[in-house]
């Protein structure tokens, strides 16, 4: 019988790379007339990883990384209010890209990801903040709606399609995609549907959280080159999500009550107090600002998912004065946009102060926040924009509060 540790000529097998024989190494892997030992496999892997790091570093080596105050000031140009949220995002994004810029560092301490969770009502500026950040940093950016996502194999959009869309955004440049920003909206809508995680298969709730968890914490995602569902015959792009920054946002309706219950119970322990009186004292208090991970878990997010979103920022509901500022102040303010639109017709458009107040009040009443401002203006200007191109010698159009409150027609001033 031939010793299985020797070849036919009774000689020891040797690694084709380092020359060590099979007795000097733990394992020898055979190929087409060549062999490689376990030590050389590890060495080759280290070389590949080092080259990968060098490539990633070269992307950001010469990149100018704006300081948190510069990011904050840029956000201020487009987003009104939400000072705390802007500051939190500025620092988080700065730290994230500072980490990428210093990938070449030999520091043994591994820096974690600064993924962010934005909590706030509809129209408070969550999506706008994320969009403005990506535009300023000039990195690939997409918005995904969590309500359309399902587990792989079920009807709906696979979670990994989010990465497919990011690749599309940067013309399938994998290196760019691996340093982009993904904003997942309506994240509160994928909360667990039951307190009992095993009661039923929750493919659009806990199942999606589990699938997103892998992407957010960092994994190699296999994305079909032609998009669509995966099948064995497809070719794939392999995207490392480790350095993709994830920002999740949601209104989290009902979370306020969960926090309120925790805070009031905690404050009442050991004291003979009337909970109802306590509630009356605190009824104007914004409990959302006191949110803790335990509250999000009780709301329906799984603990592992909450743990991957270490930075939580709460956005408050916009008031009337802030809504008026949104109408007139930012670089791309709505009033400025409509004035430009009318200027293209050779007509000056004017909103008086009372009109702006009425628009802001209506948006506040409808609870649509800044998002509802455009639809209100579009509605009151619809007939005017329809008839204006057919009118001659129009010099100016004035919008007053009567147009909003009493459905009056705008004032036309002719040459």
Curated annotation (Swiss-Prot):
UniProt binding sites for ATP: 121-128
SUPFAM superfamilies: Glucocorticoid receptor-like (DNA-binding domain) (SSF57716), P-loop containing nucleoside triphosphate hydrolases (SSF52540)
GO biological process, one term: proteolysis involved in protein catabolic process
Domain named ClpX-type ZB: residues: 3-56
Pfam families in the record: AAA_2, ClpB_D2-small, zf-C4_ClpX
UniProt-annotated binding residues for Zn(2+): 15, 18, 37, 40
Keywords: ATP-binding, Chaperone, Metal-binding, Nucleotide-binding, Zinc
GO molecular function: ATP binding; ATP hydrolysis activity; ATP-dependent protein folding chaperone; protein dimerization activity; unfolded protein binding; zinc ion binding
Family: Belongs to the ClpX chaperone family.
Assembly and interaction partners: Component of the ClpX-ClpP complex. Forms a hexameric ring that, in the presence of ATP, binds to fourteen ClpP subunits assembled into a disk-like structure with a central cavity, resembling the structure of eukaryotic proteasomes.
Protein name: ATP-dependent Clp protease ATP-binding subunit ClpX
Lineage: Bacteria, Pseudomonadati, Pseudomonadota, Gammaproteobacteria, Enterobacterales
């Amino acid at each position: 019988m031939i010793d299985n540790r020797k070849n036919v000529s009774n000689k020891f097998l040797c690694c084709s790379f380092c020359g060590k024989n099979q007795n000097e190494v733990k394992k020898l892997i055979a190929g087409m007339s060549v062999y490689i030992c376990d030590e050389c496999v590890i060495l080759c892997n280290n070389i590949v990883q080092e080259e990968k790091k060098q490539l990633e570093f070269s992307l950001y080596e010469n990149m100018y990384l704006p300081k948190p105050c510069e990011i904050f000031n840029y956000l201020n140009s487009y987003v009104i209010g939400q000072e705390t949220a802007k500051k939190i995002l500025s620092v988080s994004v700065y730290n994230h890209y500072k980490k990428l810029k210093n990938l070449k560092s030999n520091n043994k301490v591994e820096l974690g990801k600064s993924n962010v969770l934005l909590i706030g009502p509809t129209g408070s500026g969550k999506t706008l903040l994320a969009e403005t950040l990506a535009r300023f940093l000039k990195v690939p950016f997409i918005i995904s709606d969590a309500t359309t996502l399902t587990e792989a194999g079920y009807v709906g959009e696979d979670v990994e399609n989010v990465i497919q869309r990011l690749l599309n955004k940067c013309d399938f440049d994998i290196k760019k995609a691996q340093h982009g920003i993904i904003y997942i909206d309506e994240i509160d809508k994928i909360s667990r549907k039951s307190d009992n995680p095993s009661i039923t298969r929750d493919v659009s709730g806990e199942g999606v959280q589990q699938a997103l968890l892998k992407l957010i914490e960092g994994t190699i995602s296999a994305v079909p080159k032609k998009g669509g569902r995966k099948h064995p015959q497809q070719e794939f792009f392999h995207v490392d999500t480790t350095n993709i920054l994830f920002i999740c946002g949601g209104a989290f309706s009902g979370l306020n009550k969960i926090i309120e219950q925790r805070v009031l119970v905690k404050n009442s322990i050991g004291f003979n107090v009337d909970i109802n009186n306590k509630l009356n004292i605190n009824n104007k208090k914004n409990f959302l600002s006191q949110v803790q991970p335990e509250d999000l878990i009780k709301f329906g997010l799984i603990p592992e998912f909450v743990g991957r979103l270490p930075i939580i920022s709460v956005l408050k509901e916009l008031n009337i004065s802030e809504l008026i500022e949104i109408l007139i102040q930012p670089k791309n303010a709505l009033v400025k946009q409509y004035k430009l639109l009318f200027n293209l017709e050779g007509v000056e458009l004017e909103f008086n102060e009372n009109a702006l107040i009425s628009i802001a009040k209506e948006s506040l009443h409808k609870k649509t926040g800044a998002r509802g401002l455009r639809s209100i203006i579009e509605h009151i200007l619809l007939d005017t924009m329809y008839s204006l191109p057919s009118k001659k010698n129009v010099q100016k159009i004035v919008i007053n509060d009567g147009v909003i409150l009493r459905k009056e027609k705008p004032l036309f001033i002719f040459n």
